C-alpha cells in the first residue's frame, strides 16, 4: 500500500472513530412525522432529519450508491422530508449556526436530486433529465429554487466552505459518495473532513504521476477552483500555477504527507480526469 493510501486510511479511521452514527428511528405515521418536523422548525431549533436519515440508511450503500428502483417504490419518507423543507421559515433558518445552515442546504440539494432522479427513473444519467439544474424548481424556505440556485447562489456565494464540493452529490459515478446519514451542524466539520479524505484517497480523483511531475485531479477541482482561493490562496508555493490552481493544490497538502507531499509540492502541471456522468445506482 502506498503512502498516500496509508495516510488516508489512518485519517479516515480517526474520523470514523470520532464521529457519531445515525440511529434509526421507528417509523411514525405521515402526519406525525410532518408535525414533528414543522414543530421543530417553529421552535428555532436545528431542523429534524428523521425522514431523510431513514432514506439514506435504507437505500444508500457504503459506496454511496443508491437503490433508485426501491426508493421510487417507497418514496413516502423522501417526499415528506422534501415537503418539510419548504415550511421552514426564514426567521427560523437565520436563528441557526452557520454549520447548521450549510448542513441544511447540502441535505436539501442532495435530497432534491434524489427526487429528480426517481421522478424520471429509470434514467442512465442525471444529464438525461432536461433542465434538472437550471429550470426544475423545489420549495425551500417558502420559495421556489433550482439546484443551481442552491449551489451557486447560496452555498458557494454565502459561505466560505469549499469542502461542500466533497458533499454535494449530483447522482453521478464521479460525484463524492452520498453519505448514509444526513449532515448535521454539530457533526459537519467531521463529516466534511471524512468526505474529503475519502474523496482524495481514490486514484480517480487525485493522483500524482512522478514520471512527468503531473498531478491528476477530479474535474470538480477544475470547475470550482476559485472556491479555494479565499482560504488556501498562496504566493509562496505552487508558483508555476495560477492562483486558483495553486489554491487547490495548497488545500490538498493538508491531506498528504511524506513522499506524497514532496511529490505534490514538486508538481509541474495539472490535468483533470474525465467526469463519469453515469448514474450512481446500485
Where do the protein language model's features map onto the residues?
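Bacterial N-terminal signal peptides that target proteins for export
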Residues: 1-9
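Interaction/scaffold regions that mediate signaling and macromolecular assembly across diverse proteins
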Residues: 22-95, 99-106, 110-282
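Residue-level signal for mature regions of secreted extracellular proteins and peptides
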Residues: 13-14
